[in-house]
């Protein structure tokens, strides 16, 4: 995205290993619209949660647009997400979370042991909230597609672990095994 926003700037992506081949890329991944919270004590906290949820929504929309534009097969599955617990005493936490979700307009459903085991295929969990907004993807496939479509001003350096970094006046110097980079702005 930075390459698109700043087409006249060089953008370097540096990965310690092959991009899209790390542990997170080998697992299933979720794009989420909500994260678990057991309730809020103030309207300010609720506003902050809503801001986070809005960011998640923007992210999901951007990824969906990308996979459509580039016809990416990343096993996109709008299956929703379960916030589940094996402890029945966690029902109160989930009730508070359900109230928060409802206040913010997120559909959610309480599911208990028998129905839950039918849906999940295990009797381990006792209680859960189901939300529709979670999307299961294969992150490795998505990352590799993003790598294949990098803008011309974005350069990828793989198998390049960061050895050291230090701030020098108005810039940051990053030291790698056989090279270094000095830049005004760096995102770690």
PLM segments and residue spans:
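Flavin (FAD/FMN) cofactor-binding and adjacent substrate-gating region
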Residues: 37-41, 65-145
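Flavin (primarily FAD) binding-site architecture
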Residues: 188
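A generic structural signal for alpha->beta connector loops
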Residues: 8-10, 71-73, 105-107, 153, ...
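Short, hydrophobic/amphipathic alpha-helical packing segments
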Residues: 56-63, 143
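Helical element adjacent to the flavin cofactor pocket in flavoenzyme catalytic cores
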Residues: 98-104, 123-185
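Glycine-rich active-site loop/strand segments that organize a redox cofactor
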Residues: 22-55
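Glycine-rich FAD pyrophosphate-binding loop
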Residues: 3-26
